[in-house]
């Protein structure tokens, strides 16, 4: 949520759009966590994964369609565009890693999945903060 807050404030978006994006992000995280923690039904895990991905699509819509116009009007489109692309590209890695990793179809080992999440976390948060 903090990355979206920073991007929304940078784009000088309205509070309703900011609240919607952060709410969708929290929904994505909570349903993604539920998908990872459910052990009773593999199908139910994928249902929660799908719901999480639907929340993610809503977040992507805000980042890629709504906020760029706000950033243009605010005069911050260059830095917003850089941070937006960094965020979108790295965040796309999380659902892919979940699906291929030990929580999903288990094509990747637990270690590779864990290192993948760690790498995405470091890049998504620290590189974002550095820029």
UniProtKB/Swiss-Prot annotation:
Q: Which domain of life is it from?
A: Archaea
Q: Which residues carry this modification: N6-(retinylidene)lysine?
A: 125
One GO biological process this protein is involved in is: phototransduction
Q: Which UniProt keywords apply?
A: Cell membrane, Chloride, Chromophore, Ion transport, Membrane, Photoreceptor protein, Receptor, Retinal protein, Sensory transduction, Transmembrane, Transmembrane helix, Transport
Identify the residue ranges that face the Cytoplasmic compartment according to the record: 12-14, 65-76
Where it mainly occurs, coarsely classed, is membrane
Record-annotated membrane-spanning stretches: 1-11, 15-38, 42-64, 77-100, 110-131
Per UniProt, subcellular location reads as:
Cell membrane
Q: Extracellular face: residue ranges?
A: 39-41, 101-109
* SMART domains referenced in this protein's UniProt entry, alphabetically: Bac_rhodopsin
Report how it sits in the membrane: Multi-pass membrane protein
Stored InterPro entries? Arc/bac/fun_rhodopsins, Rhodopsin_retinal_BS
Q: Which GO terms describe its cellular component?
A: plasma membrane
The family database entries (Gene3D superfamilies) matched by this protein are listed as: Rhodopsin 7-helix transmembrane proteins
Pfam families, sorted: Bac_rhodopsin
- Sample GO molecular function, one term: monoatomic ion channel activity
**What does it do?**
Light-driven chloride pump.
Q: Which PANTHER family match?
A: BACTERIORHODOPSIN _OPSIN, NOPA (EUROFUNG), PTHR28286
Q: Which family does it belong to?
A: Belongs to the archaeal/bacterial/fungal opsin family.
Name this polypeptide is given: Cruxhalorhodopsin-1
Originating species: Haloarcula argentinensis
Gene this chain is encoded by: choP1
